[in-house]
Amino acid sequence: MLNGTVISYGNYDKASERLFGGIGDGVLFKADFDKYINFCVYHDLQMVFDFGIKLSEKQLAKVRKGIAKLERNITRWKPPYQLATENSPISDIADFDDYCSSLWNGTHARFYKFKSGRFKTYFVMSTNCVFLADYILSKAGTDIVKTAGIIT
């Protein structure tokens, strides 16, 4: 979370899934922290553990710069339910079984796809959410994740 916004990366486009969801288009989303936690707890029925890292102002500036670099390589993408409601306001979420549609319905998160580069394709064993977090945090000089082998 940064400035009250959750940033997540995964294979959220069900239409692009291959290998049982292990591979697909890399999708980044941003959501309001409180709305996202509420969604996770009440929609997904998940217990949420929130961890933080204390960064200096200099490190935080580097993290923001890393995020800005990523943002130059993304383009807006809309989940199926969001597109449906734009075309017909009476669309029913019950007609959509993809996670990103439910997430958008519950949080109005903004979704993005990568235009090119290593995050364009999500792969559960390497190019995943942990790898993206490490990419961002490494800009601040942290060495939290060992990125050899399977990254989890």
Region locations from a protein language model:
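Active-site nucleophilic cysteine motif
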Residues: F119-I151
